[in-house]
Structure formats: C-alpha cells, structure tokens
Swiss-Prot record:
Membrane side Cytoplasmic: residue ranges: 1-16, 77-98, 160-163
Cellular component aspect of the GO annotation: endoplasmic reticulum; endoplasmic reticulum membrane
UniProt organism field: Schizosaccharomyces pombe (strain 972 / ATCC 24843)
InterPro entries assigned: DER1, Rhomboid-like_sf
Transmembrane segments: 17-37, 56-76, 99-119, 139-159, 164-184
UniProt membrane topology term: Multi-pass membrane protein
Entry keyword set: Endoplasmic reticulum, Membrane, Transmembrane, Transmembrane helix
Location(s), subcellular: Endoplasmic reticulum membrane
Entry's Gene Ontology molecular function annotations: signal recognition particle binding
The keyword Transmembrane helix belongs to this UniProt entry's keyword annotation: yes
Name recorded for this polypeptide: Uncharacterized derlin-like protein C1687.17c
Lumenal side: 38-55, 120-138, 185-190
Family: Belongs to the derlin family.
Protein origin, superkingdom: Eukaryota
Amino acid sequence: MAILPEFISQTPPVTRYIVLGTLFTTLAVNFGYVSDLKIFFNWKLFLAKGEYWRAITTFLYVGPFGLELILYLSFLLRFMSMLERSSPPPQTQSFLKTVLIVWFSLLVTSYFSYMPFAASYFSFTMLYIWSWKHPLYRISILGLFDVKAPYVPWVMVLLRWLRTGIFPLLDLISALIGHVYFFVTDFSTV
C-alpha cells in the first residue's frame, strides 16, 4: 500500500491526473461500468447533444486492459513526468498549457479524420515533443538497439507500420502537431 502515496508524492500533478484518469477510465470500461460507446469522440454527439465529456475521455481510454495499457501508463509516467519537470516555470501551468494545446489540436484533427480514441496519438505527440526537448537521451527499442531521442518517434512509426501493415498517417499528423508546437515554443521569438 505504500506504492500509492509514493506515486502521488513523486509524480508531477498534470501527469498524475492524466495517468489516474487513464487508469480509471480504462478500468471502468473493462469492468462494464461504462461502455466505450459512451466515451469515444464524435463531433455530432459533442456539438449537437452536448456530450462534452467526450473531448476528455477520448484521451483517457487506451483499450482493453492488458500489456498495451501497462506500457502506455509506464510511458506516461516516465516521459511525461520528465517533460513536465523540464517545462519552464511555473512548471505545472506551462505543462498543462502544452497538454491542452495538443488535445485541442488532436480534436481539430479528428474533425477531418476518423479518430474515436485519441490516447495513442496524444502519447505519440507528447513523445515527439519530449524527444526534441531531450535530444541527448538514448532509448532502447525492444532491447535490440539504442536510438537517440529525436529518432524514437520515427522508429515507432516504422514499427507500427510493420506491425499493422497500414500506413500510420495519424501518427505522422501527431508528429506534425508536436513539431509545430516544439518549433513555435522553442524557436519562435513571438
């Protein structure tokens, strides 16, 4: 039981709430408390029926409980915590702004493409931003080889393409969102 208090005290606030929200949303769907049909993002339901929670839950549901959820949560804890801690002061507000901009950008993207659940695209965008803010890190890919951080998103795109056989257009759009955000916030004089 000492794990939960330690997690709460050591995880930055925005990352903590996203991780807990993802865990609770995924468990609620998997245990049948909520149907995934009630939480996926759909513009018609969002605008016409006023189901505004869908704009948040689309980023908090990963899929069936299993290895993908565990890997996703470990990613969030590791990379998003580092990104939140390295955000400019005040850290929590700066990182929350980043998360909200990425969420909004992905929601706009979902208007033009089918993206009922955006958690994986959100994590990919955050991975892209993290990789460029921490370019000297090396990440082990499947324990087979090491890659410098800026190349990790591209290796992930290639692995998804090889695994599914489907061109990962939405991953590339997520990378573009991350690139624009990184360029505007780190290189722009505006």
